[in-house]
Amino acid sequence: MLVTLTPELLLQAYTQGFFPMAEGQGQRIYWYEPDPRAVFELDKVHFSKRLLRVIRQERFEIRYSTAFERVIRACADRPSTWISEEIIRTYIRLYRTGYGQSVESWLDGELVGGLYGVSLGGAFFGESMFCRVSDASKVAFFHLVERLRGRGFALLDTQFANEHLVQFHVVEIPRREYRQRLKGALALPCKFR
């Protein structure tokens, strides 16, 4: 049975630990609940000394949720992507309800990197990142972590671990533990924007 992807369905899925991915443009959407689940411990995220120097230089202007559609489309703009047009349209609708978020790195008035995700209670579900200038997405990620820490978020879900995320000390936890953390985080009255 095919189900239409809606913002309401997305939010319900996230509260249960599921997220969607498409198999290429125009392809069917599948729902995932990985075990183990990749998350960041917000008080243990690691940033290299080199990256911290780049951040201190304030080379990038950081903006929050001002160019959500441009960010998600930039994340999808690669030879192989799980971000279908249906996913893009639905997440844009989710953004308009206040749950879809982006963190953007701008350089000389141009969007050069960033990430997008979903905030729900005290949980942030990171979806994807893109980078057109060296360090732009890493700087956006740093500012995401700082914002989540400062606003009392308890969970930064990154779904799957990969080589890029290892440098920031991503950890994998069993599904049961993830569900417990998710339940606690969802109960928090946090606001991203």
From Swiss-Prot:
Keywords tagged on the record: Acyltransferase, Cytoplasm, Transferase
Enzyme class: transferase
Entry EC no(s): 2.3.2.6
Domain of life: Bacteria
SUPFAM superfamilies in the record: Acyl-CoA N-acyltransferases (Nat)
Catalyzed reaction equations: N-terminal L-lysyl-[protein] + L-leucyl-tRNA(Leu) = N-terminal L-leucyl-L-lysyl-[protein] + tRNA(Leu) + H(+); N-terminal L-arginyl-[protein] + L-leucyl-tRNA(Leu) = N-terminal L-leucyl-L-arginyl-[protein] + tRNA(Leu) + H(+); L-phenylalanyl-tRNA(Phe) + an N-terminal L-alpha-aminoacyl-[protein] = an N-terminal L-phenylalanyl-L-alpha-aminoacyl-[protein] + tRNA(Phe)
Pfam families named among the record's database cross-references: Leu_Phe_trans (PF03588)
Subcellular location: Cytoplasm
The UniProt record lists the keyword Acyltransferase: yes
GO molecular function: leucyl-tRNA--protein transferase activity
CC terms in the record's Gene Ontology section: cytoplasm
InterPro entries linked to this entry: Acyl_CoA_acyltransferase (IPR016181), Leu/Phe-tRNA_Trfase (IPR004616), Leu/Phe-tRNA_Trfase_C (IPR042203), Leu/Phe-tRNA_Trfase_N (IPR042221)
One GO process term, biological-process aspect: protein catabolic process
Protein role: Functions in the N-end rule pathway of protein degradation where it conjugates Leu, Phe and, less efficiently, Met from aminoacyl-tRNAs to the N-termini of proteins containing an N-terminal arginine or lysine.
Family statement: Belongs to the L/F-transferase family.
Protein name: Leucyl/phenylalanyl-tRNA--protein transferase
Species of provenance: Gloeobacter violaceus (strain ATCC 29082 / PCC 7421)
Gene field: aat
